[in-house]
Amino acid sequence: MARDYYGLLGVSRNASDADIKRAYRKLARELHPDINPDEAAQAKFKEISMAYEVLSDPEKRRIVDLGGDPMENAAASPSGFGGFGGLGDVFEAFFGGSSASRGPIGRVRPGSDSLLPMWLDLEECATGVTKQVTVDTAVLCDRCQGKGTNGDSAPIPCDTCGGRGEVQTVQRSLLGQMVTARPCPTCRGVGVVIPDPCCQCVGDGRVRARREITVKIPSGVGDGMRVRLAAQGEVGPGGGPAGDLYVEVHEQAHDIFVRDGDDLHCTVSVPMVDAALGTTITVDAILDGMSEIDISPGTQPGSVIELRGQGMPHLRSNTRGNLHVHVEVMVPTRLDQHDTELLRELKRRRSRDVAEVRSTHAAGGGLFSRLRETFTNR
């Protein structure tokens, strides 16, 4: 059964174009989503918008007057090409429009997310930190409280698009006429205009301002990680809900420690004599203060001592990484006569030990000699 488009607008079948437009504008002022957020009103607004679209088009109105419904075919084939499936999408991509009506985007929309870089040193990443930062962002207009209007004035449906937020154009192609829908240039797709806008925000419902935000960084964060602060981003147009603020951590290089995930690496220099005889040194760990490390006798250059659980805290648990201490053996560059004599004596003693080992192997008493005799019967 065909819809009663005249009844939806409350006009007679003999109504003029001006009468139809006047009736639609009166109903749109009451039912537009930006004016009346009730769900029933929104459904009614869609119906009267469809009725106005039909009756304001001479060809579609002629079909109605003959007892037909021009929107039934449109519902069966929203792309305008019936059984040709996605052919309408091809023409949409080619011509930059669409024959399907999308409706107004709404004046009140969510705000954008914001990204704030923050530089932290290794200690702050390890312990966590709370900082006050200043951001330049979009905030709610305090004069109109986001309405965008001046005083008691209110938005009204756009005359250009009739509150639909889009205008339709007819293009001729080799396959015939194509009806494409584009955002209305007057209301920019919103569907309403503000005749008396707020003098502070000029109808946008928000203004640019600098504001202080408290940022709490948890312990264990690392370079490139982002901390999300819900609803701390930009306020949306028309006083819409604010987006989120993302704080991106940039970790500064440390003078002593190199970070590898939750593990830390550092290098300590140990005198040659201490490496040979053994000693105890102290390392200033990030969270544990001064830690004592035992250097075993005979420690070689490049040795790594692992201190478990003394690295960085894990972001989402109570565990910690390890501290890896790389030993660098320092060889003295300046020796007095006494030091030189001591080292030469040590060299002679070590040389005798090496000679004794070699003579043992030459006499056949070595391990490899015995193995050779076993497998070769020599």
UniProtKB/Swiss-Prot annotation:
GO biological process, any: protein refolding
Matching InterPro entries: DnaJ (IPR012724), DnaJ_C (IPR002939), DnaJ_domain (IPR001623), HSP40/DnaJ_pept-bd (IPR008971), HSP_DnaJ_Cys-rich_dom (IPR001305), HSP_DnaJ_Cys-rich_dom_sf (IPR036410), J_dom_sf (IPR036869)
Names of required cofactors: Zn(2+)
SUPFAM superfamilies cross-referenced by the UniProt entry: Chaperone J-domain, DnaJ/Hsp40 cysteine-rich domain, HSP40/DnaJ peptide-binding domain
Segments crossing the lipid bilayer: none
One Pfam family matching this protein: DnaJ_CXXCXGXG
Top-level taxon: Bacteria
Stated name of the protein: Chaperone protein DnaJ 2
Lineage: Bacteria, Bacillati, Actinomycetota, Actinomycetes, Mycobacteriales
Gene this chain is encoded by: dnaJ2
